[in-house]
Amino acid sequence: MKLGLMFVNSGPFSNPTLLAHLATTAERCGIESLWTVEHVVIPENYQSPYPYSSSGKIPGGEDVSIPDPLLPLTFIAALTKKVKLATGVLILPQRHPLYVAKEMATLDALSNGRAILGIGSGWLKEEFDSLGLDFHTRGARTDESIKAMRALWSEGASSFHGKHFNFGPVKCYPKPVQKGGVPIHVGGHSTAAAKRAGRYGDGFFPALGEIPKLKELFGVMKAEAEKAGRNPASIELSTMGRPRVDDLKALQDIGVSRVVIAPPAFDVEGLTRGLEKLQNEVIAKI
């Protein structure tokens, strides 16, 4: 079982000193991966329900600091040697896949093969409206983007011709260090996300769900993978959870190999104490 930290670019971690301490201490204490989140803007008085809180609102309110998800990972890459650098999640249909493919390949090269691209299709309609994008075609654009990026990460020139994206032949360098390209982990806890992970994902990351719900989603993912002629066992399963040994082992029993948690504190001393406690009381026992 691997343990990751979520929200490493948001709130107080937009401070470079605190982010640097979080990254280096997390690596020293055995944290496997660091995950960033994304919203390019948060429209005032939005009505779309945030799916990960009972209030339906983003924690921290509309004024919460959410830096770009990729630049902090590049910052972390320069300070660390082995911790994985992940987006959790990047809102893929808000970006052109040519740019995402270039950025992720660059991050993978600079970090010597440590990048993970966690992607979501988005929930905040007003954010799509602000960008001039059609919220209702986000699923189709997400699917095309995954296929387009994989084409760009292949050797030589590449082309893609879809309804939403059309290019090529073009060349795009550098290529990712990781063979086969940067791993793409599909986020979300909907049936559509589970099916997308089964068809296209290197990983599936439903951030919410008790074990019965996760088992249901994993079943949907596995059935879709088999339908697509893929081996479901090749798709890595991650989720968010609590850093308790019994809880982690229960998740491991249903196939989860990574659990991502919130940072244990938001100050230097608290992070040091909290991460060392995780190392001694949790990581050492899983």
Where are these regions (language model features)?
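Active-site-adjacent structural elements that line small-molecule/cofactor binding pockets in enzymes
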Residues: M1-I286
